[in-house]
Every structure is written in structure tokens, then in C-alpha cells.
């Protein structure tokens, strides 16, 4: 989630700086003060809204994901954002137990292409990456349009272009479908149930996963983004989808985790 940042003040010149540097600093300071006024008026409310409920940090190593570190640092949720492969977590079974004891796990896109041969992880996620074809337009159907992870999008979500995953090993009686497809766009001749996003309760914990998130124009709301195919409206819908799922996983938004295996 991109949070607007407050303007930074100019660096003060040295005490013995020449008058030209002092004049430049004073001009920059005046411009900064105007920028702060504009920030407080136009941007600060949005920034406060986005940071009021939770803080986020990026882990550059795996040690912070040990169960003990998660407890010691009072971490409420872990996000696998486009991770892939056999991540050497310090204690994978302990990590799954941390979720069961009240933690939250959130996976995005290639998060299901992670630890595919590790039973504690695949059992926790309840769905495994099984390949994808070329990027295509896709029509998504809501499994639960009242759930926060629906993003207030409604019954149908039309994507102009995305890399749509195939998912295997999902026990539908253990998850609540949030978004799914009735036809996979890479295999339009096949009718069925193709998971896109789901949630589940796991012991005292919660899991939210979405297969979406490959294209940059889903993440970015920059209308001038090079190569944009999805409109900015879709980018905002994607953000609402993610933020709704994160808030639900953290217990900040109500929503059911009751499995809905007959949804089609």
C-alpha cells in the first residue's frame, strides 16, 4: 500500500556558509512551508487513514519469521507477496502453528508457488499453484460479495489483462471462496470452478490469499504507467481487494470464514 509521505525540509547550511547558500536555503524553506500547508490540507488525511490501523515493515531476511521472533516482536500478520520457491523458513511447522494460535497469513499471487512441497504450508494455504498461460482478460465472480476482500466490487469483476493461475489441491470444504472463475480464460472450453481468492479460519488464526497481482498496472494507480492495459479503476479495485483481505485477516473488518463449497 503506497502511503503519501510528508515533505522533507531542506538541509540547513553550515554556520559559515556564504550568503548565496543562505539565500538558497531561505527560498527552499519558504517553498517547504507552502508544501507542508498543502500536505496538511490535501494529503495528510489520506496518509492518516492508511496508517491508523496497522503498521507494515519489509523483512529482508527470514530470521524475523521464526515463531519466537514473531511472538517477541508482537507481529500480527505475515505477508508473502510474490514469493516463490522453497523459502528456508527457520521453523516451517512452527510458523504454521503460529498462525493456528492466532496469527494471520496473507499470500499474494506467487505466494501459492512457494513451499509447494512443504505439507505444513500447503495445508495452511489450502491451494497450490498449478501453472498459468499467457496473460488474458478475465471475468471473476464473487463467492461472497459482502466479504471485505470483495473490495466492494460487487458480483462481477472484469480484468482487462492478468496472469491467471490454475490452482490445485484445494479442499473447498475448508475455504470460503471470495472470487472465482466459471471458465478459465486460457481454457475457455472447460467449464468448472477456478479459484481466484479465498479466506479460511485456521484454529484461532486467519488466512487470506489472492492469485492476482502479476501486472504492474494492477498495483500502480499511475495513469501514465508505460504499458498500462488495466484502467486505473481496476487498480483501485485491486487495492481495495487487498486491503479488505488484510483488514479481515487482522481482525479489523468483519467477514465470514465459513466454507462455501457449493458456490459456483
Predicted features by range, described:
Residues 1-107, 111-114:
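Helical hinge/lid and interdomain linker segments adjacent to catalytic or ligand-binding clefts
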Residues 8-38, 42-54, 185-194, 201-264:
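Extracellular ligand-binding/catalytic regions of CAZymes and related secreted enzymes
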Residues 33, 37-50, 54-63, 127-211:
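Catalytic beta-strand/loop cores that center a nucleophilic Ser/Cys/Thr
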Residues 79-82, 103, 153, 249-253:
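Sec/Tat-exported extracytoplasmic proteins
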Residues 83-87, 105, 111-115, 155-157, ...:
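Solvent-exposed loop/turn segments at secondary-structure junctions
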Residues 90-91, 117, 192-194:
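Residues at alpha-helix caps and immediate loop-helix transition turns in enzyme cores, especially N-
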Residues 96, 122, 150, 243-247:
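Non-transmembrane alpha-helical segments in soluble domains
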Residues 113-125:
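Glycine-rich, charge-decorated loop segments at or immediately adjacent to ligand/cofactor-binding or catalytic sites
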Amino acid at each position: 500500500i503506497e502511503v503519501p509521505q510528508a515533505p522533507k525540509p531542506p538541509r540547513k547550511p553550515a554556520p559559515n556558509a556564504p550568503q548565496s547558500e543562505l539565500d538558497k536555503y531561505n527560498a527552499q524553506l519558504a517553498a517547504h512551508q507552502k508544501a507542508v500547508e498543502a500536505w496538511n490540507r490535501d494529503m495528510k488525511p489520506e496518509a492518516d487513514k492508511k496508517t491508523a490501523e496497522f503498521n507494515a515493515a519489509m523483512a529482508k531476511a527470514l530470521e524475523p519469521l521464526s515463531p519466537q521472533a514473531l511472538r517477541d516482536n508482537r507481529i500480527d500478520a505475515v505477508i508473502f507477496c510474490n514469493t516463490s520457491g522453497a523459502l528456508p523458513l527457520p521453523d516451517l511447522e512452527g510458523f504454521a502453528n503460529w498462525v493456528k494460535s492466532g496469527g494471520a497469513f496473507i499470500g499474494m499471487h506467487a505466494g501459492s508457488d512457494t513451499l509447494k512441497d512443504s505439507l505444513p504450508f500447503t495445508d495452511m494455504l489450502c491451494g497450490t499453484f498449478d501453472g498459468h498461460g499467457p496473460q488474458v482478460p478475465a471475468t471473476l465472480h464473487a463467492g461472497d460479495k459482502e466479504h471485505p476482500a470483495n473490495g466492494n466490487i460487487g458480483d462481477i469483476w472484469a480484468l482487462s489483462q492478468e496472469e491467471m493461475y490454475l490452482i490445485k489441491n484445494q479442499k473447498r470444504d475448508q475455504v470460503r471462496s471470495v472470487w472465482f472463475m466459471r471458465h478459465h480464460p486460457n481454457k475457455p472450453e472447460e467449464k468448472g470452478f477456478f479459484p481466484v481468492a479465498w479466506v479460511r479460519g485456521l484454529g484461532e488464526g486467519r488466512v487470506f490469499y489472492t492469485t492476482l497481482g502479476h501486472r504492474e498496472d494492477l498495483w500502480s494507480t499511475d495513469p501514465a504507467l508505460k504499458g498500462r492495459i488495466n484502467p486505473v479503476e481496476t487498480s483501485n479495485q485491486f487495492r481495495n481487494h487487498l486491503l479488505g483481505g488484510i483488514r479481515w485477516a487482522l481482525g479489523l473488518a468483519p467477514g465470514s470464514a465459513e466454507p462455501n463449497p457449493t458456490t459456483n
